[in-house]
A protein has these predicted regions:
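Short secondary-structure boundary/capping segments
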Residues: 75-78, 118-121, 146-149
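Acidic, metal-coordinating catalytic cores used for nucleic-acid/nucleotide bond scission
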Residues: 65, 86, 105-115, 133, ...
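Arginine/glycine-rich "motif VI" loop of SF2 helicases in the C-terminal RecA-like domain
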Residues: 93, 120-127
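Histidine- and aromatic-rich ligand-binding microenvironments
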Residues: 100, 106-107, 150
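Phosphate-handling DNA/RNA-contact segment within nucleic-acid enzymes
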Residues: 1-97, 101, 114-115
């Protein structure tokens, strides 16, 4: 399955592909070039920025399907970092629209590490940051498809402060 990757103005700057079987790599993006730098693009920002501005909140997820499922169920302030790497450039994109960032990455090993790195990058910013630890190790796509947009919004309301998340993570280890 191929996904067009657009810049903030809705112009196609690259493509992302996802295999539908168990082969690897699971995702493959266009190579980085002058118009496509993965760390400077938020997937679906061109569609989400109005909702982000209205709600003053951006929900940051990892991948295409997380965003698409959320938007299809009416949760339209969701964007993806195209993997697990949140960057300062992502923050610059969001700072004009949002006061709060909800980190809603997958709760696998890579996702947990990415949340910790994102918390570090966000700690000296003006953003209010909360972390949504998806229940039962699910990713946002699975959760939204199985429970719906309203349930996802309710889950977002229960997102915790970064320190609470980090403390709970240290207790798990």
């Amino acid at each position: 399955v191929m996904f067009p990757i657009m810049d903030g103005k809705g112009r196609v700057v690259g493509f992302g592909g996802r295999v539908m079987d168990d082969s690897t790599p699971k995702y493959l993006n266009s190579p980085e070039c002058q118009i496509f730098e993965k760390g400077k693009i938020l997937f679906a920002f061109d569609k989400a920025y109005k909702s982000i501005r209205e709600e003053k909140q951006a929900i940051l997820v990892e991948g295409y399907m997380d965003v698409i499922s959320a938007h299809n169920k009416g949760v339209t302030n969701v964007v993806a970092s195209l993997g697990t790497a949140y960057t300062k450039d992502h923050g610059h994109i969001l700072m004009r629209q949002a006061d709060e960032i909800i980190l809603a990455y997958d709760m696998d090993g890579a996702g947990r590490q990415a949340v910790t790195r994102a918390i570090e990058l966000l700690q000296n910013t003006d953003f209010k940051v909360r972390v949504l630890a998806m229940p039962d190790g699910k990713d946002p796509d699975d959760y939204v498809r199985n429970h719906g947009g309203k349930a996802f919004k309710e889950l977002v309301e229960k997102a915790v402060k970064p320190l609470d998340y980090l403390l709970s993570e240290s207790l798990i280890k």
